[in-house]
Design a protein with these regions (language model features):
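A ubiquitous, low-specificity "background" feature that marks scattered single residues
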Residues: 76, 95, 101, 106-109, ...
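Sequence-level detector for tyrosine residue identity
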Residues: 2, 55, 90, 122-124, ...
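Hydrophobic alpha-helical segments, chiefly the membrane-spanning helices
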Residues: 34-58, 63-89, 93
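Short secondary-structure junctions and interdomain/linker hinges
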Residues: 55, 85, 112-116, 175
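Aromatic-enriched hydrophobic runs in primary sequence
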Residues: 3, 27, 60, 67, ...
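N-terminal, Lys/Arg-enriched amphipathic/low-complexity engagement segments
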Residues: 1-50, 99-119, 123
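Acidic, serine/proline-rich low-complexity intrinsically disordered regions
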Residues: 144-372
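Helix-turn-helix/homeodomain-like alpha-helical modules used for DNA recognition
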Residues: 93-154
Length: 372
């Protein structure tokens, strides 16, 4: 039972003023611009866009600024704004094979067509605090080193490269996913509620906007023995992909821009079943921006959730689609947990009365000890 109450209007307005002051901080300190957030906190921006289901770096930066860095609150703001936007059409499926690659690695093949492209990554840093970053560059001209780094990043983009999983496909060693007859439109979770059992397309939608921390924990559990799969990173790629529309009025597709994406294809050994030969199976992850950890966790959980269709026993939480999909959304989780701090006066009073009555009844039933 939820009890709706109306608080004092003046108190609420004052609370909102205090919130704005706390968000701004010391007025003597220069305020963050959206460009600074977008450029220098790009990984946070990518997470907000992914879990907010809206690709717009400027709006994601605004949401982070308004939420004072609270990622889940920023995701809430972006999703709320998304509901106000008109839907003008649908793009054709993104062609990640045609990605302009900034980073591309494989843990399964050392020498692969197009080569390993390290790109920007924390993987080879020492995880030591860089105190050079404490320098306040306000009013300073860009250093030659900074200009050189920017030029290097610009030159680092590589053209389309073949998918690593295609190498296994050439030998027939990895499962294929043919397009279903009629190519039915996938269930749209942004317009229709989640229903069980959910097909893979619906599960992938849920995981794509699911909480990164939750998916990371679920993916981690699959590596600690709670499933029987041994994953390998077939390929992780990060770069830009064209968004293409095919308007009915035109006889040709039209590129309307490009977006940054991270894609992960995880391969797992599969011993085979009564209908399928031994082969490698796939787990898939896709996220906006540079979001490798999210894409990897998503691909691990995707593969775990495929246990029933592959004839595997469903024994662990990561394999139970109702458990995973019902608890992956951080807005639902945050809302349900945080509603506990709202007034529950009537609920608590009823339980308080009940506890008092139970204690009184227990006192009457307990025999009194004989006096000495």
């Amino acid at each position: 039972m939820y009890v709706a109450v109306k608080g004092g209007e003046t108190a609420i307005l004052n609370s909102q003023k205090l919130l704005a002051e706390e968000r701004r901080g010391d007025p003597a300190v220069p305020e963050l611009s959206l460009a600074q957030i977008r450029q220098q906190l790009r990984l946070a921006v990518a997470r907000v866009m992914t879990e907010g289901s809206l690709y717009d770096p400027d709006l994601a930066a605004l949401a982070l600024k308004q939420a004072a860095g609270d990622t889940v609150e920023a995701i809430f703001l972006l999703r709320a704004h998304r509901t106000t936007l008109p839907r003008l059409g649908y793009s054709v499926p993104l062609d990640t094979a045609g990605m302009t690659v900034l980073r591309r690695i494989s843990a399964t093949f050392k020498d692969l067509p197009g080569g390993q492209i390290l790109g920007p990554t924390y993987d080879y840093t020492q995880r030591l605090l860089d105190f050079d970053l404490t320098f306040d560059p306000a009013g300073q001209a860009p250093s030659p080193a900074a200009a050189e780094r920017a030029e290097t990043a610009q030159d680092a983009a590589h053209g389309p490269t073949p998918s690593v999983v295609d190498l296994l496909d050439q030998e027939g060693l990895v499962e294929t996913h043919p397009i279903p007859e009629g190519d039915p439109a996938p269930h749209d979770l942004t317009r229709e509620p989640l229903r069980f059992p959910a097909d893979r397309a619906t599960r992938l939608q849920n995981l794509a906007r699911g909480d990164e921390g939750f998916l990371l924990a679920m993916g981690y559990s699959t590596q600690r023995g709670y499933t029987h799969s041994h994953p390998f990173v077939g390929e992780i790629r990060f770069g830009t992909v064209d968004v293409v529309l095919a308007p009915e009025e035109l006889d040709f597709p039209l590129s309307i821009g490009e977006i940054e994406l991270t894609e992960c294809q995880m391969v797992n050994q599969f011993a085979g079943s009564k209908t399928e030969p031994p082969q490698f199976t796939r787990g898939y992850g896709l996220a906006f921006g540079h979001s490798e950890r999210k894409a990897m966790a998503m691909s691990l959980v995707d593969r775990a959730l495929r246990a029933p269709e592959l004839g595997e026993a469903v024994q662990s939480p990561a394999q139970m689609q109702e458990f995973v999909l019902s608890h992956s959304d951080n807005l639902e989780a945050s809302g349900f947990v945080q509603h506990l701090k709202l007034p529950h006066y009537v609920d608590f009073q009823s339980e308080l009365d009940l506890v008092r009555k139970m204690r009184a009844a227990q006192a009457q039933q307990t025999p009194k000890a004989d006096a000495p």
